[in-house]
């Protein structure tokens, strides 16, 4: 028997409508919620459903419901994931509340969030701006270079969050523009991620920083995903 079940819902509110796919344990009531941004990348290109189902099948892994939130397309990604306050509010309120209503066993507000590239930036932004709802984030090659490393330079005065941060040793490009919005990247992913990790540690957050072999690619993100989620969610649930 499969250890998990995948459902599909639509969440509407604050001017947004997003498809959300839910992956939850079959035999245990979930006590933790993890939002996965960039659902299309994680499900269609990384194979996250099988990887996470293997985690859920282990008794040692905290029973968790994973909510994969659609990004629609690249234009929406560039708008929504650039620390957009309205979209962050939609995730923290409408999406979390809709999932929590379906799983009454979810304990409190110590949720987590996971993303890659721009959605990795959005994941960190969500944790720092909604600390009462989120306890930590997994940020795979997060785009912390965005807007002159704005998030690194504007840390809220709080501590105690969990961050799994990773980046490839080949992510050294700088001085480039990203389509379709022309978003400008002046510093490398590698340098920006390292500086964000250092700042988070200075602010007394618990940080695990990994530099993997490779570039800005799906394959290494997929390879490290189970370990990233296991570390993050176990860290959070052990404190609950």
Locations of regions flagged by a protein language model:
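Non-catalytic cap/lid and distal C-terminal segments of serine-dependent acyl enzymes
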Residues: 1-240
